[in-house]
Amino acid sequence: MQTPTLGQLATENGAQVVGDPDLAIVGLAPLDQAGPGELSFLSNPLYLQQALDSQAGAVIVSAADLERVRAEGRADGRNWLVARNPYVCFARVAQRFDRAANTDTRTGIDPRATVAPDAVVPASCYIGPNVVIERGARLGERVRILANGYVGAQAEIGDDSLLYANVSVYHDCVVGARAILHSGVVIGADGFGFAPDIGATGVEYVKIPQTGRAVLGNDVEVGANTAIDRGAMADTVIEDGCKIDNQVQIAHNVRVGAHTVIAGCAAVSGSTRIGRFCVIGGAANFSGHLNIADRTTVSGGTSITKSITKPGGHFTSVFPFLPHGEWERNAAIVRGLTRLRERVVALERRLRGQAAGSQPSQD
């Protein structure tokens, strides 16, 4: 990759250079570690002092933060890349410097791979060692499937998608264009569906065949060891632009709306529908058969047990952490709340009775 100049990066990202546009940018680094020739960014005014002290060759800033730097008398003689959204600008510049994405130009099928004769694998694809592609599977252009991947019968993988090592896409499932599936992802395993048959000797759980699919839209990224189960009859659907972190469980028949982000270890129970542009914190969990409105934010560790109908809300159910002894004392109080409520209700009744008895006679 040719080393870009600050001016080139500005042109590519709709930003403005304050300083030397011919400065060669050789890499990216945090504010407190960057050196000459490296680009960093400031997206939070709390780190303004780090930006002032940084040895970075240039810093991506907003116009407002650059004015704060000027107010400190520290802007002159330095290089700034002024962007409407410094964090987004940094992300796009980082894509340019992503060596893993930009240097892997391999194509072809590794001789150790197994590809069904009727599978569609364009010449622009790369199929790594020990990959198995079953009958009728269809890959788009420039798909890369790294070592030990599995694509089931009749499954589809869209153009420019990347499946890291040990990713499994089960039969009939669909992965859209430009997907990134990290190692250990499983798309389309059976949903957790069993019918309880109660007999004289106990309960037998009868497996319900999961005949739906798991369908991922375009530009979806799924983190390591996440499972997205196939539907029982209808499909499980992850819409365009969703970003799902590591170790997330998406159960059968769930639908996640476009451009929703879900952080690590969250779990969504069956048939729940999450709206568009939602933000789900780590270890949040959802009961089944719920409807969650668009643009809902759920804090990490929160349990959602009822539908949310109003868009744009922020919900939290986590008790803040405390020193252990204080937490135990509070827990003891919580255990006694039912008895305390009963006492308060009884006292209120007595007071109302006393008030009624003390009123003057109307005779």
Curated annotation (Swiss-Prot):
The active site is at 252 (proton acceptor). One of its GO terms (molecular function) is N-acyltransferase activity. It is an enzyme of class 2 (transferase). GO terms for cellular component: membrane. One of its GO terms (biological process) is lipid A biosynthetic process. It catalyses: a UDP-3-O-[(3R)-3-hydroxyacyl]-alpha-D-glucosamine + a (3R)-hydroxyacyl-[ACP] = a UDP-2-N,3-O-bis[(3R)-3-hydroxyacyl]-alpha-D-glucosamine + holo-[ACP] + H(+). It holds the Pfam family LpxD. Keywords: Acyltransferase, Lipid A biosynthesis, Lipid biosynthesis, Lipid metabolism, Repeat, Transferase. Disulfide bonds: none annotated. Its EC number is 2.3.1.191. The keyword Acyltransferase applies. Pathway: Bacterial outer membrane biogenesis; LPS lipid A biosynthesis. Catalyzes the N-acylation of UDP-3-O-acylglucosamine using 3-hydroxyacyl-ACP as the acyl donor. Is involved in the biosynthesis of lipid A, a phosphorylated glycolipid that anchors the lipopolysaccharide to the outer membrane of the cell. Homotrimer. Belongs to the transferase hexapeptide repeat family. LpxD subfamily. This is UDP-3-O-acylglucosamine N-acyltransferase. The gene is lpxD.
